[in-house]
Swiss-Prot record:
Catalytic reactions on record: tRNA(Ser) + L-serine + ATP = L-seryl-tRNA(Ser) + AMP + diphosphate + H(+); tRNA(Sec) + L-serine + ATP = L-seryl-tRNA(Sec) + AMP + diphosphate + H(+)
Domain notes per entry: Consists of two distinct domains, a catalytic core and a N-terminal extension that is involved in tRNA binding.
PANTHER family to which the protein is assigned, alphabetical: SERINE--TRNA LIGASE, SERYL-TRNA SYNTHETASE
Name of the protein this chain belongs to: Serine--tRNA ligase
Pathway: Aminoacyl-tRNA biosynthesis; selenocysteinyl-tRNA(Sec) biosynthesis; L-seryl-tRNA(Sec) from L-serine and tRNA(Sec): step 1/1
EC annotation from Swiss-Prot or TrEMBL: 6.1.1.11
Keywords: Aminoacyl-tRNA synthetase, ATP-binding, Cytoplasm, Ligase, Nucleotide-binding, Protein biosynthesis
Biological processes, Gene Ontology terms: selenocysteine biosynthetic process; seryl-tRNA aminoacylation
Localization terms from the record: Cytoplasm
Alphabetized HAMAP family for the sequence: Ser_tRNA_synth_type1
Stretches assigned to coiled coil: none
CDD domains membership: SerRS_core (cd00770)
Length: 430
């Protein structure tokens, strides 16, 4: 959520920056609502002052033995007018807030201006895609060869865009998540967390999934109207519960940064993606991810973004997977991000790079919604923290990359050296 004072005092400057994202801010509508708010604010304050003054007059008149009934009626009338003005002001402020909740974050100045993914800018590349001297198999074919990926069983159990993993493929999937968690906790300084997979409405508002992206979520539907689970939703990413751990908190600046990680399943409806990536593990309704979240001082957030992205890169480097790093243009960034790096891993069967991690600086956009603040010992004044989030990594897509990049001519899959301790020393699947 943007700073309301910025929207009030510099609407044209805000509109210009939002236009870089392809978002049109209705400055005239906001201006009209703000003028009406000011009028109502003054009206309620004047009515409150007048009622207080007349209420005091009742006591004074009573002490003098005067008839207080006319004054009492007048105070009652002022009270009714005040209640009506307050109700109108509350409704207007709610309307302004509803509009503010749909406005995306401002892009950082260094973010390239563009319309969509075609305007993203490559920053660097790591590794060289392997040249195969045999016909490359995709991960679906490899998974079926080793009886490790069963999409038909998942359709029977649930529906499309789900999978049942079995045997050594399932074991490698688990090994990847354990390897990522160990790397982030033991070398990168993150604290491991286990979080709920169902969250409430306040949590979803805090990180920006609501109200704008309600259609992307899986919501619970209780059997009884009175059930207290009616407002729960499955998490689309561990960013949601991890970041909200600081909601409503005032943090000592000496305790920053706070660096958290969690391995969770993620649940997404994939609204708007009909017909895209229908084969395999690339786009699923349920997938695992190891998430990284940092809570930092405002002046440290850009450096933290570089650090966090480097942590995600380290996973790919240790796995020996070629990838490229890109900075997203203004038109392709997520709703809450001010700056985002994507890491795209090489997928041999598609002969292209595919997103495997997205790392974003959100500035104080989420913190303002959550009222997450920090305070130094030398200053009693609080300020909003900055929040960052990043994939470290998407486990299913990492499994795809390992299976395809490490495949052998006979269909076996070599186990990357860093994963072997998690697989009892196994060198090959198959």
């Amino acid at each position: 959520m943007l700073d309301p004072n910025l929207l009030r005092n510099e609407p044209d400057a805000v509109a210009e920056k939002l236009a870089r994202r392809g978002f049109k801010l209705d400055v005239d509508k906001l201006g009209a609502l703000e003028e009406r708010r000011k009028v109502l604010q003054v009206k309620t304050e004047n009515l409150q002052a007048e009622r207080n003054s007349r209420s005091k007059s009742i006591g004074q008149a009573k002490a003098r033995g005067e008839d207080i009934e006319p004054l009492r009626l007048e105070v009652n009338k002022l009270g009714e007018e005040l209640d009506a003005a307050k109700a109108e002001l509350d409704a207007l402020q709610a309307e302004i807030r509803d509009i503010a909740l749909t406005i995306p974050n401002l892009p950082a100045d260094e973010v390239p201006v563009g319309k969509d993914e075609n305007d993203n800018v490559e920053v660097s590349c790591w590794g060289t895609p392997r040249e195969f001297d045999f016909e490359v198999r995709d991960h679906v074919t490899l998974g079926e060869m080793h009886s490790g990926l069963d999409f038909a069983a998942a359709v029977k159990l649930t529906g499309s865009r789900f999978v049942v993993m079995k045997g050594q493929i399932a074991r490698m999937h688990r090994a990847l998540s354990q390897f990522m968690l160990d790397l982030h906790t033991e070398q990168h300084g993150y604290s491991e967390n286990y979080v709920p997979y169902l969250v409430n409405q306040d949590t979803l508002y805090g990180t920006g999934q609501l109200p704008k992206f309600a259609g992307d979520l899986f919501h619970t539907r209780p059997l009884e109207e009175e059930a207290d689970t009616s407002n729960y939703a499955l998490i689309p990413t561990a960013e949601v519960p991890l970041t909200n751990l600081v909601r409503g908190e005032i943090i000592d600046e000496d305790d920053l940064p706070i660096k958290m990680t969690a391995h969770t399943p993620c649940f997404r409806s994939e609204a708007g993606s009909y017909g895209r990536d229908t084969r395999g593990l690339i786009r699923m309704h349920q997938f695992d991810k190891v998430e990284m979240v940092q809570i930092v001082r405002p002046e440290d957030s850009m450096a933290a973004l570089e650090e966090m992205t480097g942590h995600a890169e380290k996973v790919l480097q240790l796995l020996g997977l070629p990838y490229r790093k890109i900075i997203l243009c203004t038109g392709d960034m997520g709703f809450g991000a001010c700056k985002t790096y994507d890491l795209e891993v090489w997928i041999p069967a598609q002969n292209t790079y595919r997103e495997i991690s997205s790392c974003s600086n959100v500035w104080d956009f989420q913190a303002r919604r959550m009222q997450a603040r920090c305070r130094s010992k030398s200053d009693k004044k609080t300020r909003l923290v900055h929040t960052l989030n990043g994939s470290g990594l998407a486990v299913g897509r990492t499994l795809v990359a390992v299976m395809e990049n490490y495949q052998q001519a006979d269909g076996r899959i070599e186990v990357p050296e860093v994963l072997r301790p998690y697989m009892n020393g196994l060198e090959y699947i198959g």
